[in-house]
Amino acid sequence: MPAPRRRPLVFVILAALVGGLALISLGVWLGARHPSALPGPLERALAGPPADRVVEEALDDVGSTYYRKIPRSQLRDDAIAGVVAKLQDRFSNYFTPAEYKRFKDQQESSFTGVGITVSSDPRGLRVQKVFDGSPAKRAGIVAGDLFVAVNGKTLAGVSGDVATTRIKGPSGTDVTLTVAHDGKRKDVTMTRSEVSVPVVASTLREACGKKIGVVGLSQFSSGAHAEVYAALKRLQKRGAQAFVFDLRGNGGGLVDEAQLIASAFLPDGKIVTTRGRNVPERTLDATGDPIVPKGDKIAVLVDRNTASASEIVAGALQDRGRATLVGTRTFGKGVFQEVIELSNGGALDITAGQYFTPNGRNLGGRGVKTGTGLKPDVPAKDDPKTRADEALRVALRTAGGCAVKS
């Protein structure tokens, strides 16, 4: 019987190594060991490159191959912005470091800009109001003008928050806005300056034989509740028997301010409930120290640009039977965002959940993309061809308790 053939030692060692690798592979996948616990070369062989490494690899390739040189920081900014854009959520944004600084400035009652309030438009930003003495006023900008580009960059499809941050900037610097008006376009260059936003405006009017206090709020910025409280108390001292709370053109702001301002009209109970996938449900109640007595009638004046925190207040007062909504249907922003600061100085502003009125209505109605808003109890609309404020006239008669003429 012939003796068995002996395999070369090299072949045996090689077979052992291959077998060892196979066992390690089985250990990784069948034994639930994570590839990251293995040596680097073996990890790459078994699991491939980590996802973040693929992203960096793609940025490297774009930066080294594209025919024009693009700064690495811009590539990263654009990559993050692209991820957020894929959410197809008009309220979620990525702010570059410069944009984030300007975004935070929007929460204050003063900022450096051109002195306007705007609303979102699919083509850009629609001018709602121009402040007296502002760069925009001096440049001839009027309500109704449409900004379609900033410094040559289109605003079409850009979220309102990002678009407004592009207009703002350091005092003394120039910004060129492309304005569409009466079917024509022209570039208007303005020098940014410090702009103080009148957060609250108040006046005493008469209707139906009663003195009516009118309080207008432009934004729910930090400390806005204190100005609203002060205005209400001043009007009460002057004999106000009912109130019109004007939220037209108010695009919202801080939810905590909305709670405090609604508390000026509500003695107790629920104001708003927030719910999200990864955030605990939260209910905000009235603080229990109202300024306006229960017997005083209130009309809340709203329009299509009344949004977010404004809708929280208007919706709470409507649901609780405390006020009559006058005007047009509101914007319908039934979601809230969470701001997440990033290590590069920028930030993500991501939709984290929805909010609901005391009766459980979601203000967005049909969800993130299109909102139904709040339906007014008394429809009223201004005629842009007249200088009169027809909607305010209806609100005054509503608060005064007399019949509203159709």
Question: What are the functions of these language-model segments?
Answer:
Residues 2-91:
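Terminal targeting/pro-maturation regions of precursor/exported proteins
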Residues 16-24, 201-406:
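C-terminal "post-core" interaction segments
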Residues 50, 132-145, 198-203:
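PDZ/PDZ-like domain micro-motif
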Residues 58, 79, 116, 136, ...:
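Terminal peptide-recognition signature
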Residues 63, 136-159, 243-246:
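Conserved PDZ fold ligand-binding element
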Residues 78, 90-126, 191:
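PDZ/PDZ-like peptide-tail recognition elements
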Residues 125-126, 148, 162-201, 351-352, ...:
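PDZ-domain C-terminal substructure recognizer with occasional recognition of PDZ-binding tails
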Residues 146-178, 257, 333-334, 339:
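PDZ domains, with a preference for the canonical peptide-binding region formed by the helix
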